[in-house]
Every structure is written in C-alpha cells, then in structure tokens.
C-alpha cells in the first residue's frame, strides 16, 4: 500500500481504532478486500468505467466518515461491516486507476489483479497488526481508550481526509 497508499492506510487505521479486538477488524478488512476486488476487477476488464474526479474525493470522504463514526460512536455497530463493504467498492475503483496506470498488458490482468489484492491484503494486515501491538494490546481494554486514543487519532484522520477531499474536488 506504499508509496502512494496513505489514504488506504488511514482508512484501515480508522477501521481498527473502533475495533481494538483483532477478530472484528479482520472481518472488516476481509469485507473491504472482497468489495474492492470486485470493482477493481470490473474496472480492469472495462465492465465499469469509474470517473476518478468523482471516485477520489469519495474515497477521502469515506475515510472521514469512518473516522467521524469512531468519534461519535462509543462502540462498533453491526452495520459497520456493510458500510465498509460499500466503501470498499469505491476504493476498488481508485485502485483500478493506480493499477491501470502501470500499463499492464491485457493478458496479464488476472495475475496482476490477484497479486495486487494479495499485496494490499498483506499491507492491511501489517497495518492492523502493528496498530494492535502498539495500541490495543496495551490500551484497548482501558476505560480511557476511546476518549484519549480513539477520539484524538480519529479527529486527526478526519481532518486529513477532509483536506484530501477538498484538494481532490478543487
């Protein structure tokens, strides 16, 4: 997800913050991966033609939404996985732009798609496990976790995402 995946990293961190236990965040990560794989594949095979002028600001707004949900919701809701899946569909369209800019020959789309998704998933798992070890393992069950860790970090992520959204719109 590096060097150009900072928006992706912030999205995954936002998912993690409200889900300091590994199982819920791994399910969200899986839903996100399945969703972005679908739209990435459809875009790579020209079934859909996403407009990056729309997709890129929506990606930034999706990061902001999840970060704000972290701030205003004291706990993970069951609907979160559906929201993450929907946002994954949008992120897949953004990934398609990045992958297609590499100029891949059409006979290697499937292999490239599979390898790209494996790489993205490994990157997501690395971000999740690192965040879990640095934050949740030590502080995730503390009474102050939401107030002093989730809210400030989510506010920072939301502010960055808002900046990106404005930048991508204008």
Named regions from a protein language model:
Residues 1-170:
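Membrane metalloprotein/metal-transporter helix-bundle signature
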């Amino acid at each position: 997800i590096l060097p150009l995946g900072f928006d992706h990293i912030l999205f995954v961190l936002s998912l993690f913050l409200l889900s300091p236990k590994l199982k819920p965040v791994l399910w969200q990560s899986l839903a996100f991966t399945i969703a972005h794989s679908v739209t990435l594949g459809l875009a790579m095979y020209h079934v859909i033609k996403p407009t990056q002028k729309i997709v890129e600001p929506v990606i930034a707004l999706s990061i902001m939404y999840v970060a704000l949900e972290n701030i205003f919701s004291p706990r993970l809701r069951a609907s979160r996985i559906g929201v993450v899946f929907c946002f994954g569909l949008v992120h897949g369209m953004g990934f398609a732009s990045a992958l297609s800019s590499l100029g891949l020959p059409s006979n290697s789309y499937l292999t490239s798609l599979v390898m790209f998704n494996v790489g993205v998933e490994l990157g997501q798992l690395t971000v999740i496990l690192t965040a879990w070890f640095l934050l949740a393992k030590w502080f995730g069950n503390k009474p102050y976790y939401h107030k002093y860790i989730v809210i400030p970090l989510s506010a920072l992520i939301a502010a960055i995402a808002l900046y990106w959204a404005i930048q991508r719109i204008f």
